[in-house]
Amino acid sequence: RDRSPSRGLGDVYKRQVNDAFSSDCECPICSMYKALEDDAVSYTMGPSYMEDDIRAVTDKKGFCQKHLKKVYDCENRLGFALVMKTHLDRVINDIESLQDGKVAGKSMFKKADKPAVTTYTERLEGTCFVCERIDNTFQRYLDTIFHMYKHDSDFREKYKACKGFCTKHYGILLEQAANSLKGDMLDEFIKTTNSLYIENMKRVRDDVEWFINKFDHKYIDEPWKNAKDSLVRAMIKDGSYIADEPGKRNNTR
């Protein structure tokens, strides 16, 4: 199946991918994900929460632990309260029905010995309105990376010049590459991506090591080199964690 981006929207995705790979960051894919995440959180606590069709989805899916905190941090207290009230109503009604056995049945059991309530709570734990809003567009970004690598020689050079990737997104790139690339192009992509990951992980590891050295009196007069922000960059490499900019919050109140 052709997973290349469609025209029109494809141009938007290409701009986002180009911008991310042109930026000075430890993982351009994390950078793209963070932008999508910020937009999705703002959307959740923007005017959309008053729309019945959107509220029906947030009522059903709720939020993961990470995005529950981010939605709360928007500081739209009334909006958050309304969303939480109707979501809690939905959960209470669903679980009361399951406790009473009104909707329990074989379809509610993954295993014969698993309570219907457990199946429900596990399913609820695995859904998040914000995550699911991000995921579809994020996959299109990944497809665009492979499409541009295959067809755009300038982008290939930009890809090879980036600072590598976090561990999570490195693994995703290797997993999905064969869906879009074949033969020598696939081999080159894998080789390049492997090198980018290892070389840049070592660079950040060495910066962290120098950060540690600076706490030894033997190195007190030595320059910091690139170590001052090494812990923040290590968090990106190891945990795909990009902190919000200081003073920046999604405020939709």
Functional labels for PLM-detected ranges:
Residues 66-102, 113-115:
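Hydrophobic, ordered structural segments
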Residues 34, 63, 68-71, 135, ...:
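Cys/His-rich microdomains that often coordinate metals
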Residues 1-13:
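Single conserved hydrophobic/aromatic residue that forms the stacking wall/gate
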Residues 39-45, 74-81, 140-146, 176-182:
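Short cysteine/histidine-rich zinc-coordinating motifs and their immediately flanking basic loops
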Residues 99-107, 127, 169, 185, ...:
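Long, charge-rich alpha-helical interaction segments
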